[in-house]
C-alpha cells in the first residue's frame, strides 16, 4: 500500500519546494502555546488572500475532547485565543474561542494522507493525525491554518499528542490541502 502511494506521488508530483520554503520561513517565529498535557496539537492561523476555504470532512454530534489556550504571532499579525474548547467527532473538530472580536466558532477538519505534500508524508505514515484545516466563520478575512505539534509530549495516534522527543515546535502547512 505504501509503495503504491509513493508511486502515485512520483507520477503526480506536487509543489514540495514551496511548502519547504514556507516551513523554513516559520523557523524562529514567536509561536508559543500552553494547555493541558493531552491537549490537541495547536494551530497557527494565517489569512488566505482569496478569503476562501474548503470543507474537507463533516461530522455529527461532538463529545468533549480537550481545552487549551494560547497566543500566536505570525507575520506581524497576532491572535489571542482563550478558553478554547475542542470537541472531536471522528473527522471533525469544533473549536469555540473567545478573542478581541468576541465569540467565534472554528470548524477544523482532519485531512487524509492524500491531501498532503510529500514533505509531510513521513509524519503522516508514522501514525500521527497531523492535518487540520481551520476556518473562523465569524471572521470576514477567511483563514487557513498552519498546524503546530508539541514535541514536549509523547506522540499518540489519536491526535492528542505531539511528535516524540525534543522541545521544538514543528509546523506543517495544512494550507497544502487547498
Swiss-Prot record:
Keyword Signal appears in the UniProt entry: yes
Keyword Signal: yes
Signal peptide location: 1-18
Keywords: Signal
Record's protein name: Protein 105R
Organism: Snake adenovirus serotype 1
Upper lineage: Viruses, Varidnaviria, Bamfordvirae, Preplasmiviricota, Tectiliviricetes
Amino acid at each position: 500500500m505504501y509503495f503504491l502511494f509513493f508511486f502515485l506521488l512520483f507520477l503526480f508530483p506536487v509543489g514540495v519546494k514551496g511548502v519547504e520554503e514556507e516551513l523554513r520561513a516559520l523557523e524562529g517565529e514567536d509561536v508559543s502555546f500552553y494547555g493541558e498535557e493531552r491537549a490537541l496539537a495547536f494551530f497557527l492561523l494565517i489569512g488566505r488572500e482569496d478569503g476562501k476555504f474548503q470543507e474537507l470532512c463533516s461530522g455529527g454530534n461532538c463529545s468533549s475532547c480537550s481545552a487549551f489556550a494560547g497566543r500566536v504571532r505570525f507575520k506581524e499579525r497576532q491572535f489571542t485565543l482563550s478558553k478554547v474548547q475542542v470537541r472531536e467527532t471522528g473527522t471533525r473538530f469544533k473549536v469555540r474561542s473567545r478573542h478581541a472580536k468576541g465569540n467565534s466558532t472554528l470548524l477544523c477538519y482532519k485531512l487524509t494522507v492524500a491531501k498532503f505534500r510529500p514533505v509531510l508524508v513521513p509524519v503522516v505514515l508514522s501514525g500521527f493525525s497531523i492535518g487540520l484545516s481551520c476556518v473562523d466563520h465569524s471572521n470576514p478575512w477567511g483563514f487557513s491554518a498552519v498546524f503546530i505539534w508539541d514535541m514536549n509530549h509523547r506522540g499518540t495516534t489519536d491526535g492528542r499528542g505531539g511528535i516524540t522527543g525534543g522541545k521544538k515546535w514543528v509546523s506543517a502547512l495544512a494550507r497544502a490541502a487547498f
